C-alpha cells in the first residue's frame, strides 16, 4: 500500500502542485491560470485536475490525502473565491477518485508557516518565498531549479504529511489505551464472578454441585489469561 499526499498552493495567477508518494517526490508543477474570475474558474480547475492525472498511478487500496492552502487575505471576496475554488477541486477530485480511499483537508494559508520556526507569520511575501525555497532545498534535499510556487506546494505537502502521520500515531496510541482499559475492566469483571462462585462453592455440600462450580471457575480463569 502506498501513501499519496498532494500539496496545492492556490494563487490568482499561478498555482503550484506537489505530489508525494511515501514521502518521496513524484511530481511538481505549476499551472498558469488565465483569469481568476467566475467565468474561468471552472475551466482552470479542470485544467489542474487533468495536469495531476492521479488515476493513472493510484491503486485501489492506496491511501490518498490532499492538503489545499486556502487564502488568508484581507479582502473577503477574494478569500471567498479561493474557498469556492478549493471546494471545486475537492468535489472534482472526489468524482475522479471515487474508487479510492480519499481524505481531503483544507487549512489556512499561513497555518503551515507557523510550524516552521524560521518562517514568521508576518514575513514579507517575497522573503517568505525565498525562505521556503531554501528550507525545501536544505531540509529535504530538493533540487534548486523549481519555481517558487512548486516550493510552496512542497512545503504544504510535507506539512500535511507530517500532520497526518502525527494524527495517525495519536489515533493508534488512543486505540491501544482503550484496548488496555477494556482488558483491565474485563479482568476485574471476571475476578468478581470468580469470587462469587467461590463464595457459592463454600456453601455447597453435594460433590456434583461443587464440581459444576469448579468447572465454571476454570472457564473464567481461561478467559482471564
From Swiss-Prot:
One of its GO terms (molecular function) is nucleic acid binding. InterPro entries: RNaseH-like_sf (IPR012337), RNaseH_sf (IPR036397). This is Uncharacterized protein UU157. The lineage of its organism: Bacteria, Bacillati, Mycoplasmatota, Mycoplasmoidales, Mycoplasmoidaceae.
Amino acid at each position: 500500500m502506498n501513501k499519496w499526499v498532494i500539496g496545492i498552493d492556490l494563487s490568482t495567477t499561478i498555482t503550484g502542485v506537489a505530489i508525494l508518494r511515501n514521502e518521496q517526490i513524484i511530481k511538481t508543477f505549476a499551472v498558469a491560470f488565465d483569469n481568476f474570475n467566475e467565468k474561468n474558474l471552472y475551466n482552470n480547475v479542470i485544467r489542474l485536475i487533468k495536469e495531476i492525472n492521479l488515476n493513472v498511478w493510484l491503486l485501489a487500496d492506496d491511501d490518498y490525502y490532499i492538503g489545499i492552502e486556502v487564502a488568508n487575505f484581507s479582502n473577503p471576496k477574494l478569500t471567498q473565491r479561493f474557498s469556492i475554488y478549493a471546494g471545486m477541486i475537492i468535489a472534482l477530485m472526489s468524482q475522479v477518485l471515487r474508487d479510492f480511499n480519499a481524505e481531503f483537508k483544507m487549512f489556512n494559508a499561513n497555518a503551515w508557516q507557523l510550524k516552521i520556526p524560521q518562517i514568521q507569520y508576518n514575513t514579507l511575501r517575497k522573503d517568505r518565498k525565498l525562505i521556503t525555497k531554501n528550507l525545501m532545498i536544505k531540509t529535504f534535499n530538493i533540487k534548486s531549479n523549481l519555481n517558487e510556487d512548486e516550493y510552496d506546494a512542497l512545503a504544504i505537502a510535507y506539512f500535511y504529511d507530517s500532520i497526518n502521520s502525527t494524527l495517525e500515531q495519536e489515533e493508534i496510541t488512543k486505540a491501544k489505551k482503550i484496548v488496555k482499559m477494556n482488558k483491565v475492566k474485563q479482568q476485574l469483571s471476571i475476578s468478581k464472578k470468580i469470587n462469587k462462585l467461590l463464595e457459592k462453592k463454600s456453601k455447597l455440600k453435594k460433590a456434583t454441585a461443587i464440581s459444576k462450580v469448579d468447572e465454571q471457575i476454570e472457564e473464567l480463569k481461561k478467559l482471564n489469561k
